[in-house]
Amino acid sequence: ISRYILEEHMNTGTLVRQRGSDCLDIRFGLYDYHGGLQCGETLDVKISGKWVPTRIEMGEDWYLVGIDVDDLIGLIVRI
């Protein structure tokens, strides 16, 4: 399957903290969430107008492999 075909079926949303926990989630709409992110899960993040493939991991806090930002909350992602 080509990357182009896969991109057509990806959902775009915003990284948010899950209410009442330290877990991260993706919000797609007012009441539409991914359901929580797990270590090792792959996603794309929009940086300077371009989609960059990465994966989410947990050290002292959540981070995206190869992405150097101070705060993940509010980043536009697709999965």
Give a label for each model feature.
Residues H34-K46:
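Short coil-to-beta transition motif at edge beta-strands of beta-rich domains
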Residues K50-I79:
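Short, compact, well-ordered microdomains
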